[in-house]
Amino acid sequence: MKETKFHWKEADHWFTIKLQPWLDVGCGNNKHIDCLGIDKRQLEGVDLVHDVENIPWPFKDESCSMILLNHLIEHIKPWLTIDFMNECWRVLEFNGLLILVTPYGFSLRHFQDPTHCNPWVESTPFYFVPGNNLYDIYKPKQWTIEKLIYAVDGDLGVAMRKIEDISPETEKEVRNKWKHVYMGAKKTPYNREIMKVHV
C-alpha cells in the first residue's frame, strides 16, 4: 500500500494518507490541485456536478482516501448534518482522512455570509467521536479526531479519521481521554490551549 503526506496549511501539519483518489467536496472554483472536485454549480475546475445534500453521492463505498470540506459545512442544512457526515464516512475507506475547515460558529466570518446556516464550534466535532457524552445523543458513524484548531475570531479546522466500531475496552479509554467534553460546556468554559494540545 503506497502512502503520501498531505500538508494542511491551516494547521501547519502533515498527515499520512493513502494515494488518491481524494475528493474536494463543495470545491467551487478553488479546487485542491490533486483532488476530484464536486460542486452543485458548474464552475471552472469542477469535475462532477452534484448537490451534496442529495444523498447518496454517486460514489461507491470506501472509494476515496481523503475528503476536503473547505468552507462547506456551514452551508449544509443543520438537519442534514448527521446524514452528510455519515455519507462522508461511507465514501471514505477505513482510516481515511476528513479535513473540515469552517468559520468559527460565533465569529463575524460566520455571520457575514447570508447563506451560512450551520455554525460549528470546538465541541461540535465531538458529536461524531465515540466515548463522550455528545456522541451518545445521536450515535452517528464513528470518527476520531487527529487535529483540532480554532480561533474565535477566525476559522475552526478539524482533521478526523474514519474508524469502525470500537470495542468496549477502547471506548472506555476514549471516554477517559475526552472526559472534559460536556454538552454546552456546563462545567467550565472551553479552553483553547487545552483543546489544542490533547488531540
Q: For each predicted feature, which ranges?
A:
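Conserved alpha-helix/loop element of class I SAM-dependent methyltransferases that forms part
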Residues: K2-Q20
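S-adenosyl-L-methionine-dependent methyltransferase catalytic module, highlighting the catalytic core
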Residues: W79-D83, E87-V199
